[in-house]
């Protein structure tokens, strides 16, 4: 579970970086919903074991197109149970993770994100920024290649999401143009 958490954490961190960068390139203020979700989760957990997420409580979080339910069980409040929502609305358990491990992973993600964004802001390429993160984390060459592969996969997801956003915007423009054309043809507009 630790390795899975680290991989998911790294992927989420890169997704946040790339999403924020894509959003900024589109004229946004360099914030994304993914950042807000991560900040919300960190706020729920930081400052002590599970502070903000009471024993027996759960919260649903959106991440990378999926809904995850994070629950702090009554029997073991130092663990978080994580489940993913299926298309039929039911939840399937993914596993358990220690609250302190989540906090440590999120702090590490923040550190990696800062290194990554500083490198990009200095004009480094994505590959150079990845190398900076790998060096800071002490990754060997095989682990660095795995990180590069994860970044490529996440970049593909981000590109697909940006294409969907562009398609939705074009659809809205087309709907408005069709409405205007119908209005012109029926004499309601000149």
Curated annotation (Swiss-Prot):
Glycosylation sites: 30
Subcellular location: Secreted
Highest taxon of source: Eukaryota
Keywords, in A-Z order: Glycoprotein, Secreted, Signal
Signal peptide extent: 1-24
Single GO cellular component term: extracellular region
Protein's recorded name: Dense granule protein 1
Encoding gene (name): GRA1
């Amino acid at each position: 579970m630790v390795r899975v958490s680290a991989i998911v954490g790294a992927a989420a961190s890169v997704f946040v970086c790339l999403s924020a960068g894509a959003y900024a390139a589109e004229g946004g203020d360099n914030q994304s919903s993914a950042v807000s979700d991560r900040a919300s989760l960190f706020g729920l957990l930081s400052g002590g074991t599970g502070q903000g997420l009471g024993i027996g409580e759960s919260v649903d979080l959106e991440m990378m197109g999926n809904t995850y339910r994070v629950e702090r069980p009554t029997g073991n409040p130092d663990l978080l149970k994580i489940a993913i929502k299926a298309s039929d609305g039911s939840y399937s358990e993914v596993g358990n993770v220690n609250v302190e491990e989540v906090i440590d992973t999120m702090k590490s993600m923040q550190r990696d994100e800062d290194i990554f964004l500083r490198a990009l802001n200095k004009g480094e390429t994505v590959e150079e920024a990845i190398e900076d993160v790998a060096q800071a984390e002490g990754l060997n060459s095989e682990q660095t290649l795995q990180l590069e592969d994860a970044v490529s996969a996440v970049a593909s997801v981000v590109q697909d999401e940006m294409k969907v956003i562009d398609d939705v915007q074009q659809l809205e423009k087309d709907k408005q143009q069709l409405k205007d054309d119908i209005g012109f043809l029926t004499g309601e507009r000149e």
